[in-house]
Amino acid sequence: MKQDVIVIGGGIIGCAIAYSLQKRGKRVVLLEKNNLVGGASGSCDQGILLQSKAPGEHLLLGICSMKMYETLGRELGADLEFQQKGYMLLMESQAECDAMDGIIRQQRALGLPVERIEMDEALRRQPGISREAVVGATFCPWDSEVNPYKTTLAYADAAVRLGAEIRIHTPVTGLILQGGSLCGVRTPEGEIRADTVVLACGAWTPEIGAMAGLNIPIRPRKGQAYISEAVSPFIRCNLLNARYIVAKHHPELLSDDRSLAAKLGVGFCITQSAKGNVMFGASREFAGYENTNTPDGLREILSNAVRLMPGIRSLNIIRTMSGLRPYSPDSKPLIGFVRDVPGLFLAAGHEGDGVSLAPATGKMAADLILQGKTDVPAAASFNPNRFPLTGKAA
């Protein structure tokens, strides 16, 4: 039977879109070449960060998504381990403080309740931060966390209950084009026809897009991290270092840093799961599709983490992990129909924001596919046609 929509990709973005379409009456089949949550959605922390979003449309989309998370667990009928306990960003120099002051002013103007706090307050919220390495912090009470595994699977389960079909271990081997329009896909089990095909394959989206002659400007950006054994409460307030934000918004301040850590894009983030496992990292590396942990990466991440929070030395590490984030040139996802290939819809390029932006992305995609418009804030700025998709990749 012909489907209304084929969604390619079984991460949090693909599952959110499949659910959002199915609940509004579309017949949906989701195809995943491996297992659900097998890509970046299964290799990330649980942060729903708003402080990390650039002031403007990216932040507005993040706020929209965070508000949807507040009721999403009830809607899906699952415990997503959602908590809104805030995040702190740690600053290590006066230059970072000055840069963050400017970013904070712009974020507050858009309604985000973020503020600068002194070190005494930072240490009250999270003991163990190094006074020698950290000179100040910011705090935002809206920053939250959620279990990405449980959330992705809850989206998938809810979609199936509503009638969607999910096929794992089903790679797409080709796209079916008629008169320049996309009307289906080929798999090892045969062809599937549909009015719309959604590419939500994260870092692998360009591989599928190439089957339609597209050069989608998304690149894999590897992140490495550590996982500890479960311990009693160690992290009261999730942390991220401001260097990551400064690198996104003011890279010129870091242009003279020739260290290996800078080359690997090493930053600091730390969270603790509901079961007690501590996760910390991470790197941001352009290494193609090579997705393994490396001695250099792990060494630099650990050195940086211990410098900022010496108590990490007491943790027993049980494993390391790595994942490939889908990077886009302007740090914003590509969400919308492709002008030159009717029937093809992109929802990828979220990089490290897939978990944060999944609910809003699901709604935006469903709105645009069903009615050609959406009330999700600043949706037009994520239109994939801002890039020359049929020309040379950016």
Q: PLM features: residue spans?
A:
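Short beta-strand to alpha-helix junction loop
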Residues: 60, 90-99, 139-157, 292-297, ...
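Short hydrophobic core segments
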Residues: 6-8, 185, 192-204, 362
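Active-site substrate-recognition segment that forms the wall
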Residues: 19-20, 48-49, 80-82, 174, ...
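Beta1/beta-strand and adjacent pyrophosphate-binding region of the FAD-binding site
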Residues: 1-11, 29
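Helical element adjacent to the flavin cofactor pocket in flavoenzyme catalytic cores
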Residues: 138-195
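C-terminal lid/capping helical subdomain adjacent to the catalytic/cofactor pocket in oxidative enzymes
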Residues: 3, 16, 24, 334, ...
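Glycine-rich FAD pyrophosphate-binding loop
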Residues: 22-42
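Dinucleotide-binding Rossmann-like beta1-alpha1 core, especially the glycine-rich loop
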Residues: 46-125
